[in-house]
Structures are given as structure tokens and as C-alpha cells.
Amino acid sequence: MSETLMEQCRLREQHKRRNACIAAIVTVVLVLAVAGGVWWTAGDGSALVRNMFKPKATPATQPVVNSTAAFAYRTAPEFLAMETGDRDTGNVNYSPASMWMALAIAAQGANGTTRSQLNELLGSGSLADSDYQSLLSSINGQYSGAKSEMSAANSLWIDNDYSLASDYQSTVKKMFEAEVTTLPFDDQAAAKMSDWIAKHTNGSLKPKITLRDREVLSIINTVYADGRWKDPFEEQSTGNGTFHGEAGDAQVPMMHRTFSQMAYGHDEYNTWQRVEIPFDNGGNLAIVLPAEGHFDELAGDAEKLSWAFGTCSTASLGEGAMGCAADSMPGWGVSVNSVMVNVTLPRFTIDSMFDSEATIKAFEKLGVTDAFSAGDADFTKMIDTGSHGENLYIGSILQGTRIEVNEAGAKAMSFTKVGADSVSAPVDNVEFTVDRPFLYSYVTPDGIPLFIGAVRNLGGVGGEN
């Protein structure tokens, strides 16, 4: 992953103007969702033990929830349509929360039009320092009585020939609790960055990092979440069933469970249905099942995607239910109820790698252009250039992810690398059978989408799964 990113960075050096290359490993996200009992991670230590030493979680403010959710739905159609190298299945796993945090950290060092374009995309122009801080407090806190765990960490690494601007350093420490390390950018620095990532993902992720010429800064963000199903699927209830994928039918393991009370929603024309499979901390894995012939219509339209995933569902479950990312959205004839639901859901695994060039083009399409231009980018608030006289710009953005969903839960990890060169009530019992292409979102208790994905093919049809 890192070599691909740095090659992108090297290509940017062909510009006539001399530009510093900031290779920013901006996001490493690991989400582990399992059910019941004490579950030990690959890196040793249990979530229960770690949770004992955490402060009580406090909710993220509504402004930052709204900003991250809006960014997720606005950008998701671009990423869900990308070729990600997942063995040609067409399946995609995207982490909008990772991308948001990465770009938000970079935006603090931007000025002028570069900053305003990033703020517009992120929805962060009116956010206060306390809003950013609340996001970390929500993710890093302990939820009473829950075995689920989430954590986020940030760090900035700068070559010792350079120095962070003092105001920028103060800002990222205050708002993102970022660690700052100054060191020679050599192989030892790369190894230390990899070790830091492993430490903050509980040993579960340790990417190989290669530092190339002209890199002067790396930004690393990790997010870890171990969400336990509130009501786990039973392995003995799993049996083979047919998944009608875009590329053809396949026999795949189908999990089954009856939920006595579950948030279930659909639109008035039944072009989609949604269930929210809860974790024990108030978060959930939302599954949106488009009607036949409506998958592309939904996955490719930001407003419709937001409508399907963002419709407030907690109102019908009582005031004690947590979070609602888009409670001010129009209902558009949507019915949301708490009912008994028989869920049939396939096990699946997705590996995604988002091409840097395609990612940059997507953001340019969404209005962020100056940040990627050697001539127009303004990141003068990020470093003290001193005698270097170099201009900085974002030369590459790379995100790699993995998600596994089975009887135990949803286990996912993502790796984002940003390189900067220089209506009617349903029946009482609902059958929700996911046997055709579907969409999903891993949502925090506050309603922040950590992952949004699309499953188009399973069982080796269109590729391995």
C-alpha cells in the first residue's frame, strides 16, 4: 500500500516548481464486532480489560455528527462506484469517517481557498474546537455495561529538517489529541510509524511503510472498534442459500436469527428496506436492501443514500435509544417501526483498495481542487518553511479496507493514506432476506458512519469471497 502511494508522490515531482512532498498516512481504521463473552484480539488483551481504564463516553455534539454523516453520504456514491481490486467482485468497503478525520487534520494547515474548499466538503466551517474534541471523547469513551470498544488516536511525524508551525501544532494537539514526533525520515522512522500503528490497533494491523524522497510529514490516524452483537447469530442456524448477485447466482452460507424487536424501515414505494442489527453499546450495522432493479439508483445517488441510511429510526424506540444522524431530514414517505424481524444475512468478506488518482478525481468532482494543485494549494499554516521556500500540496490519497461479517459480528479494518506533494406500518413479523445485492453501514452510538459498503456478488461469482 505504502509503495503505491509513494510512487504517486514521486510522479508529482515532475512539476517544474519545487514542491515538498508530505506523505501522510492519515487513517488506519480497525473495526472488530463480535458477540458475547470475552473476545481476545489478535494483539492480545481483552476489550473488557481495556474498557476498565477508560473514562465514560460523552456524546459527540450534533454539529460534528451532522458534518461527518453528511460527508459520508455525499462521498459514498463516488467510492461505491470505484474499482477497488476486490477480486473483480464489485464489492466495496469504504470508510468515510476515516477520510473525514484525515482531511480534517490536513485542513487545519490550509489557508485561503484551499481551506474553504476542504471546509465545504467536510462540512466543518462552523465547527468549534469542542466539536472535534467531542468526536474523540465519544469514540474513546466507555459505554456503561457494554463489552464493545472503540478508540481513536492521531499522530504527526515530521522530518527533522522541517518543523511544524507552532499554531498548527497547538491546534492538532488540542483538537485531535495528536502526538507529534520529529525525527530523520529514514527506514527507522518508517519502522517506528508501523510500530505506532500496531500499538494503536492492538497489534492487529502493522503495514509496511516505505519512506521515499522528499517526504517531510506523515499524519497517522487510527480508529479501532470492537462492537459486540447485542443478540448474536447462532452458528447452528447458518445454512447454505442462494445469493442472486449481479454476475450470477451462488450458494453461500446464510445466517439466520429472529429479532423480537428491531428497527425496520422502508420507503412508501418499497424501493428499499432497512434493518439495524444492534451492538451492545448502542451502535449498529445497518443493512439496506434495495428492491430488484433499484441497487444502482440508490448506491449512486447521495441524497437517496442519505435518505435510506440517515432516516431517524430511534424515535419509535423511545427516548432512551441513542443517536440519530439525520433527524432533520424529510421523511419522504418513510416508515420506521420497531417490530419482530426474521433476518437472513450472508457471511461475507471484502477487501478494498481505493486508487489514489481516482480518489483525487472524486474529491475534485466534489469541489476540492486547489488542495491537489501544485500551483494553487495553500498549506502555509502547516509547516515553517524557513529557507526551504517550498509549496505543499496533496499529491495522493490512498485507502485500503477489509471487512468480515459472520455469526460473531462485523470485523473490518481500513487504511487511508494521504500523500501531500509538497409511512404505513409494517406487519408484526417481517421477513428480511438478504439474497441479492445490498448496502451496509457500520454506525456508532452517535450515528456516525464508520464504514459504508456495497455487496454485489458472493460465493466466487465475479471473484473470490
What are these regions (language model features)?
Residues 262-265, 296-301, 424-425, 461-465:
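A short, polar/proline- and glycine-enriched secondary-structure boundary/capping micro-motif
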Residues 219, 271-290, 425-465:
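Extended hydrophobic
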Residues 118-122, 233-242, 296-308:
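Short Gly/aromatic-enriched secondary-structure transition segments
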Residues 290-337:
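Internal alpha/beta scaffold segment
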Residues 65-77, 410-429, 463-465:
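Short, positively charged
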Residues 89, 130-291, 326-424:
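Non-catalytic, conformational "gating/processing" segments within enzyme and secreted inhibitor domains
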